[in-house]
């Protein structure tokens, strides 16, 4: 299988396509990072104060996590922010848990934005507007706003480049046969989603790639796409782990919760993969959803149901994590 695939990509045109994919991924990751960092600079102190004041219970923490992640477009950044607040002694572990849960739901906003038809066609216009605000105005807040807009445009431009490259790849028989294996080997899809997301440290990037692959027909079956999405949610926990290294015990426990929450949720959904698939298909047929929107629905269902499932067992999970990571 792999020998045929690597023989296929030796072709010069395929290498050029792959270089385009890598470039598109780089632009996407830079855009999402620029947007998030600029937003944190623009409203960072206010955002931290709001989070500190409003996360007095888990459910409020979930809402804050959804809101913040929906704005900065990165669940990893929101999770890392909550862990940094723990390390600074400004937040307790139970408060952070709500934010982590909400961040998982909030990150699905990006998938829904990608599902809008032809949104990538406006990416260069958005980039141009952002550049004008950066280079032609001296006001710091205007410059930061320009960076946010520029990052937003780069995000969609990078995804458009990746989508174009993937659609060309999908036309090749060898690549299509390789991707078809995900339908019959869900564990391979789970592993692929985990590894890719851990490497790029962006679940939104992996989700966007899955959307493009499913839309182009490279992943011909929804059943082949779902395990990759589930693996995506495992791989994204790497950021929380890295953020907690060298931190206080509470920060390490919050990172452990993120791993426990996402990994156990993925395992449960792998067990109920067929009912999960049937529910997504039902929504697809009910709303006449496009392939990209279908993946966005699947992403939302997993993260919402996973949160609703575990929110009632937070005390028990905290007790277990304290046993695994003892200390004060």
Set out the residue ranges of the language-model regions.
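Interfacial loop-to-helix junctions that mark the boundaries of transmembrane helices
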Residues: 6-19, 112-122, 176-183, 223-226, ...
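Membrane-interfacial helix-loop connectors
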Residues: 71-72, 78-104, 112-122, 132-134, ...
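Helix-loop-helix hairpins and the membrane-proximal interhelical loops
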Residues: 3-58, 149-195, 213
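Alpha-helical transmembrane segments of multi-pass membrane proteins, especially transporters
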Residues: 45, 49, 53, 57, ...
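Hydrophobic core segments of alpha-helical transmembrane domains in multi-pass membrane transport
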Residues: 20-33, 65-69, 127-137, 151-161, ...
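Membrane-spanning helices that line or support transport/gating and their immediate boundary helices
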Residues: 30, 34-42, 46, 50, ...
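Alpha-helical transmembrane segments and their lipid-water interface positions
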Residues: 27, 40, 76-80, 107-114, ...
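Transmembrane alpha-helical segments and their short flanking loops
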Residues: 159, 166-182, 246-328
